[in-house]
């Protein structure tokens, strides 16, 4: 035990050991941090001076400017190359058309020489390749210009036309395609074959918009015929080609040169004039036929209208209708259902019954028939068939719900006097006196501007007969304003059932409560005997409405006893 105590370290020694351990840990941590920061630039290496930063920016800008200039120069070079290639394409197309002109001139002027050349060359039927025109090993010879017959002006190409290379150039006349050694033409040249007319097939060659907008556009000129000197002897022309002619149309190239075989130009002009005259004649025929059809339709409509008018007039003279509807009945009453089924207005066309009476003015009806179309054919304003006033004999069975109006008394006696006679409308009365007093709100949407409808609505002349007694008619409601408030509970109950009892609605069950205090006081004041009477009355009404309910019948019998 004593040895262990002697071996124990003092407090200071232990502190020093702890300090050493802490230093070692610090060194280890610093070494690890240094290894990690070796990838990152040290703070001493970071540039903090503004002058050096500006220099770096300037250097970067210079490099960017140089790169831009280099790219621009490359773009300019590419554009120059494109322009040069386009020029070469233009020159090649000019050479093509010059060769075509030479061929057409040889075919028209020297057919005998062409036949001799064909006989000296290979047979046309020996090989399929013999159909192509070959120009082989042509020396570089400038093109000669010869004037066409009948032309005063000549076209000269500004730049030098490059001569044809020594490679072979072939033109297939049967297919209408131009071929080189690679069998490919530039994209700006397109070839298509046209129809044969007057035993001469015309080949039209079209170039793209680049050639149209070039220095050739905007000038009216024609190529001059170009001829080669010696190498034409080696050319082999088949018999199928001798009747071909090449034309460069003005529609394809704006004011561009065209090569036309003499003799065909006048024929094409005559054809164009003939086609134009035929078109004008056909248009005139079409217009005449349309006018005739319209006149026929109008005559048919008039005849139909007149026939209908005559039939209706004859029916009016024979019999007087027995069933007529009065317009004033329930015109503004939304909840009167006595005559609802009879007065059913629809916005569609109504089929008039055979016994309907039509009083019409002759002159106005004829003018309306002429102006408007018939039925489905016309698009005129739709005039609905009018409802007429009811006879008092047919309306005698209907219960009278309102007292008689003063205005209705004027027309009652006339129905009795004219019941056996056919009614006729006055033709000399002005439209102001002919307006119907029974015009209601429901007919406002269907009112037309024609006076004929007004004449129809007044089917009875306003004559008075003092001796005749007054017949009860339903009162016309004269309210000009419309009430849009919510209907009361009584009107709601009357809406569906016309047999409800008005006294039953006086019960306190159906009275609306305005204030809670008043309702409480009234409920307290009501005696139990009165409540029992009201309940019995309610049960009776329920049984009358629903007679199939047996329980209610038993309860009513018990309560009544």
UniProtKB/Swiss-Prot annotation:
Other remarks?
Answer: Shugoshin is Japanese for guardian spirit (as it is known to be a protector of centromeric cohesin).
Q: How does it assemble?
A: Interacts with PPP2CA (or PPP2CB), PPP2R1B, PPP2R5A, PPP2R5B, PPP2R5C, PPP2R5D, PPP2R5E, SET, LRRC59, RBM10 (or RBM5), RPL10A, RPL28, RPL7, RPL7A and RPLP1. Interaction with protein phosphatase 2A occurs most probably through direct binding to the regulatory B56 subunits: PPP2R1B, PPP2R5A, PPP2R5B, PPP2R5C, PPP2R5D, PPP2R5E. Interacts with PPP2R1A and NEK2. Isoform 3 interacts with PLK1. Interacts with CDCA8.
Write out the ranges of the annotated region (Disordered): 260-331, 348-441
Tissue-wise expression:
Widely expressed. Highly expressed in testis. Expressed in lung, small intestine, breast, liver and placenta. Strongly overexpressed in 90% of breast cancers tested.
Give the location of motif D-box 1 in residue numbers.
192-200
Sequence ranges of Basic and acidic residues compositional bias: 267-296, 308-318, 410-421
Residue numbers covered by motif D-box 2: 438-446
Q: Name one GO molecular function term.
A: kinase binding
Q: Where is the composition biased (Basic residues)?
A: 297-307
> Which disease is this protein implicated in?
Chronic atrial and intestinal dysrhythmia: A disease characterized by dysregulation of the cardiac sinus node resulting in sick sinus syndrome, in association with chronic intestinal pseudo-obstruction, a disorder of gastrointestinal motility in which intestinal obstruction occurs in the absence of a mechanical obstacle.
Work out whether the entry's keyword set contains Cell division.
yes
Q: Where is the composition biased (Polar residues)?
A: 388-398
Per the UniProt entry, the effect of residue 14 to A is: Loss of phosphorylation and presence of misaligned chromosomes
Gene3D superfamilies xrefs: Single helix bin (1.20.5.730)
Q: Relate the protein's function as given in its record.
A: Plays a central role in chromosome cohesion during mitosis by preventing premature dissociation of cohesin complex from centromeres after prophase, when most of cohesin complex dissociates from chromosomes arms. May act by preventing phosphorylation of the STAG2 subunit of cohesin complex at the centromere, ensuring cohesin persistence at centromere until cohesin cleavage by ESPL1/separase at anaphase. Essential for proper chromosome segregation during mitosis and this function requires interaction with PPP2R1A.
Question: Which residue ranges does the UniProt annotation give for the motif PXVXL/I motif?
Answer: 451-455
- Give the sites modified to Phosphoserine: 14, 256, 436, 507
Under what name is this protein listed? Shugoshin 1
Query: Alphabetically, which GO biological process terms does the record hold?
Result: attachment of spindle microtubules to kinetochore; cell division; centriole-centriole cohesion; chromosome segregation; meiotic chromosome segregation; mitotic sister chromatid cohesion, centromeric
- Regarding domains, what does the record say? The KEN box and D-box 3 are required for its ubiquitination and degradation.
Stretches the record annotates as Necessary for interaction with PPP2CA and PPP2R1A? 1-176
* Database matches in InterPro entries: Shugoshin1/2, Shugoshin_C, Shugoshin_N
Give the record's keywords alphabetically: Cell cycle, Cell division, Centromere, Chromosome, Chromosome partition, Coiled coil, Cytoplasm, Cytoskeleton, Disease variant, Kinetochore, Mitosis, Nucleus, Phosphoprotein, Ubl conjugation
Q: What is the effect of changing residue 23 to E?
A: In CAID; patient fibroblasts exhibit significantly faster cell proliferation than controls; during mitosis the mutant protein is localized in an ordered fashion around the centromeres but display a rather homogeneous cytoplasmic localization pattern
């Amino acid at each position: 035990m004593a040895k262990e105590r002697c071996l124990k370290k003092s407090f200071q020694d232990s502190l020093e050991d702890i300090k050493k351990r802490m230093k070692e840990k610090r060194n280890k941590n610093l070494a690890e941090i240094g290894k990690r920061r070796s990838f990152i630039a040290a703070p001493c290496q970071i540039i903090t001076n503004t002058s050096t930063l500006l220099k770096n920016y300037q250097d970067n800008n210079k490099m960017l400017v140089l790169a831009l200039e280099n790219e621009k120069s490359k773009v300019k070079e590419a554009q120059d190359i494109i322009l040069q290639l386009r020029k070469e394409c233009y020159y090649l197309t000019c050479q093509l058309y010059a060769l075509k002109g030479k061929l057409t001139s040889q075919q028209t002027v020297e057919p005998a020489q062409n036949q001799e050349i064909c006989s000296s060359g290979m047979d046309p039927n020996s090989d399929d390749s013999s159909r192509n025109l070959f120009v082989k090993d042509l020396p570089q010879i400038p093109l000669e210009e010869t004037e066409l017959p009948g032309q005063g002006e000549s076209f000269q190409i500004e730049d030098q036309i490059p001569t044809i290379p020594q490679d072979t150039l072939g033109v297939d006349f049967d297919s209408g395609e131009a071929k080189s050694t690679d069998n490919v033409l530039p994209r700006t040249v397109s070839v298509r074959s046209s129809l044969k007319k007057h035993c001469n097939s015309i080949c039209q060659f079209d170039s793209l918009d680049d050639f149209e907008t070039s220095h050739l556009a905007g000038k009216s000129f024609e190529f001059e015929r170009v001829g080669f000197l010696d190498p034409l002897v080696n050319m082999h022309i088949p018999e199928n080609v001798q009747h071909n002619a090449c034309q460069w149309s003005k529609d394809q190239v704006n004011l561009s040169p065209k090569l036309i075989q003499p003799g065909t130009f006048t024929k094409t002009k005559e054809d164009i004039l003939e086609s134009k005259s035929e078109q004008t004649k056909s248009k005139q025929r079409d217009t005449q036929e349309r006018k005739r059809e319209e006149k026929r339709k109008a005559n048919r409509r008039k005849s139909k209208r007149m026939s209908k008018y005559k039939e209706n007039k004859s029916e009016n003279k024979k019999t007087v209708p027995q069933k007529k509807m009065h317009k004033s009945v329930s015109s503004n009453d939304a909840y009167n259902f006595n005559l609802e089924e009879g007065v059913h207005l629809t916005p569609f066309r109504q089929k008039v019954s055979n016994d309907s009476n039509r009083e019409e003015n002759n002159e106005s009806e004829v003018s309306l028939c002429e102006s408007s179309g018939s039925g489905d054919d016309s698009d005129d304003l739709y005039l609905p068939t009018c409802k007429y006033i009811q006879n008092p004999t047919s309306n005698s069975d209907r219960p009278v719900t309102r007292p008689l109006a003063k205005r209705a008394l004027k027309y009652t006696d006339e129905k009795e006097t004219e019941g056996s006679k056919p009614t006729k409308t006055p033709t000399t009365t002005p439209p102001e006196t002919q307006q119907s007093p029974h015009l209601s709100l429901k007919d406002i949407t269907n009112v037309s501007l024609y006076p004929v409808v007004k004449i129809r609505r007044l089917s009875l002349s306003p004559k008075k007969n003092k001796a005749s007694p007054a017949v009860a008619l339903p009162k016309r409601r004269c309210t000009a304003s419309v009430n849009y408030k919510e209907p009361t509970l009584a009107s709601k109950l009357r809406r569906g059932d016309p047999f409800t009892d008005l006294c039953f609605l006086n019960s306190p069950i159906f009275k609306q409560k305005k204030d809670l205090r008043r309702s409480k006081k009234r409920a307290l004041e009501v005696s139990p005997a009165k409540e029992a009477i009201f309940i019995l009355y309610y049960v009776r009404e329920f049984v009358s409405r629903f007679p199939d309910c047996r329980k209610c019948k038993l309860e009513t019998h018990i309560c009544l006893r």
